[in-house]
Amino acid sequence: MAVQQNKKSPSKRGMHRSHDFLTTSPLAVEPSTGEVHLRHHISPNGYYRGKKVVKTKND
């Protein structure tokens, strides 16, 4: 098992963890319905890039 030889200072510890924060998912707005959805995913109504691609229960 690896064991560090010297204690890592708080500054170095912070630098090591600087990219561990959470980011928000990029969202897109469907132009035909105005719904918000994840990028490169279909909207809940079944639209993708302004075209109906999947039939939903409401249709």
From Swiss-Prot:
Keywords: Ribonucleoprotein, Ribosomal protein
Listed GO MF terms: structural constituent of ribosome
UniProt keyword Ribonucleoprotein, yes or no: yes
UniProt entry tagged with the keyword Ribosomal protein: yes
GO CC entries: large ribosomal subunit
Pfam family, one: Ribosomal_L32p
GO biological process: translation
InterPro entries associated with the record: Ribosomal_bL32 (IPR002677), Ribosomal_bL32_bact (IPR044957), Ribosomal_zn-bd (IPR011332)
Biased composition regions of type Basic residues, renumbered to the chain: 49-59
Highest taxon listed in the record's lineage: Bacteria
Region spans: Disordered: 1-59
Protein family membership: Belongs to the bacterial ribosomal protein bL32 family.
Protein name stated in the entry: Large ribosomal subunit protein bL32
Gene that encodes the chain: rpmF
